[in-house]
């Protein structure tokens, strides 16, 4: 079956194209131990653009995409954020992106297989029709679909379950690792037993939290930390002006403080962070995508003794001096993934959120006429909206709600 969509290929001049593609439907499994199942047809309704899409385009430009293509193919239909209509089931759904022969995709091991719709070995959502394993079609809450149409305000929020689920996993990991890192000291300080100390420590790690970078991932993790730990002192650090909509929205959602990084040196920025927090950070989360974040945290001392450094940025290389690192008892980790329960919780939380306010729409005809130009001049350029999405099939959208 042929359908029209955007796809990546290894091509220095045109790594991203829009046109007819032959759909494939290999059997896939959601988790290890479950049966391999052929996909059922789904029709994308609204699809969001993610930084991963831009990175895949650049990989195609460099000729590095072959491992990402579905088996036997020389292209990858991209797109992994959004809502689909499932004709066979007469319902809207969110695609669970990650699956494979793995007992837990958040901690997959070298002897397990792994795929991602729209990103890695499986075709994605920027297409008129796609095949999806029926075990990987997640339900949406009641009340948002009426007469076969989805409320636009809700649809906009549903381009975020993937990154929001990633941040739910980040919160879980920071609580787990932070608790393990701190609980013995906490037990001594609070004069309590070790199990009680673990519970205290899971919150204490966020006592002075830095979120370095203010994209949607930084905004989401700040919001989630605040919901889970109302007592946390959260500081966003970014380059946007204090009075910009993005900053005002993020600060309001997370009930956080903000520091504009206009400093001449990393040392000055580190000093300002500590002053704003009232001490060195207990938790430093890097989401800026730059190599500056780890230098400010580790080299210039914004991260305090016994602190944790969570690298969620893709691209930067992290280095540190092993002598102070060991004596300061720092914990550095990175983890990018999520489980189905994270995504299901993300759908529920997002449905009650205001995150539709940060989504801008690009006209489908404009996008498909020249997708590379849209990427470079509308979606991933200086001054671009925080989040861009495209209504792929307007027949399923009620723009009055």
What are these regions (language model features)?
Residues 28-48, 61-107, 123, 143-144:
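Glycine-rich beta-strand-centered segment in the early N-terminal region that forms part
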Residues 38, 178, 267-272, 279, ...:
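C-terminal hydrophobic helical "lid"/dimerization subdomain
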Residues 47-49, 98-100, 290-291, 314-315, ...:
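Short glycine-rich anion-binding loops that position phosphate/pyrophosphate groups of nucleotides
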Residues 80, 97-208:
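NAD(P)H dinucleotide-binding glycine-rich loop of Rossmann-like/cofactor-binding domains
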Residues 180-209, 226-232, 244-331:
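Glycine-rich cofactor phosphate-binding loops and adjacent beta1-alpha1 units
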Residues 217, 242:
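Hydrophobic/small residue at the entry helix of a nucleotide-binding pocket
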Residues 237-241, 287, 336:
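N-terminal Rossmann-fold cofactor-binding loop
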Residues 307-310, 320-360:
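Rossmann-fold dehydrogenase core element
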């Amino acid at each position: 079956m042929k359908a029209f969509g955007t796809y990546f290929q290894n091509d220095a001049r045109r790594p991203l194209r829009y046109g007819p593609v032959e759909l494939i439907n290999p059997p896939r499994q959601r988790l290890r131990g479950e049966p391999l199942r052929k996909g059922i047809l789904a029709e994308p309704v609204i699809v969001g653009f993610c930084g991963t899409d831009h990175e895949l385009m650049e990989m195609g430009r460099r000729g590095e995409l072959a491992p990402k293509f579905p088996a036997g193919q020389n292209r990858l239909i991209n797109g992994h954020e959004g809502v689909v209509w499932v004709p066979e089931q007469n319902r809207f759904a969110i695609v669970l992106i990650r699956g494979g022969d793995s007992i837990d995709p958040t901690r997959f091991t070298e002897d397990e297989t792994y795929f991602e719709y729209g990103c890695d070995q499986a075709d994605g959502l920027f297409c008129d029709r796609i095949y999806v394993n029926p075990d990987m079609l997640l339900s949406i809450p009641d009340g948002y679909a009426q007469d076969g149409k989805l409320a636009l305000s809700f649809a906009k929020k549903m381009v975020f379950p993937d990154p929001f689920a990633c941040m739910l996993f980040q919160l879980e990991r920071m609580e787990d690792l932070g608790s393990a890192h701190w609980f013995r000291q906490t037990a001594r300080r609070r004069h309590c037993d070790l199990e009680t100390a673990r519970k205290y420590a899971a919150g204490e790690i966020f006592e002075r939290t830095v979120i370095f970078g203010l994209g949607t991932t930084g905004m989401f993790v700040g919001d989630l930390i605040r919901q889970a730990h109302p007592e946390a002192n959260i500081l966003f650090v970014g380059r946007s002006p204090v009075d910009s909509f993005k900053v005002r929205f993020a600060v309001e959602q997370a009930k956080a403080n903000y520091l504009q990084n206009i400093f001449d040196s990393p040392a000055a920025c580190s000093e300002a962070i500590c002053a704003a927090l009232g001490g060195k950070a207990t938790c430093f989360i890097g989401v800026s995508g730059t190599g500056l974040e780890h230098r400010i945290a580790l080299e210039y001392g914004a991260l305090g003794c016994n602190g944790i450094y969570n690298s969620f940025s893709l691209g930067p290389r992290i280095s540190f001096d092993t002598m102070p690192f060991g004596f300061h008892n720092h914990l550095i980790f990175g983890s990018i993934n999520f489980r189905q329960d994270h995504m299901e919780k993300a759908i529920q939380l997002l449905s009650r959120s205001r995150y539709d306010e940060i989504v801008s729409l690009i006209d489908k005809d404009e996008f498909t006429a020249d997708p590379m130009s849209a990427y470079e001049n509308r979606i991933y350029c200086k001054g671009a909206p925080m989040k861009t999405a495209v209504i792929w099939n307007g027949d399923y959208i009620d723009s009055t709600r």
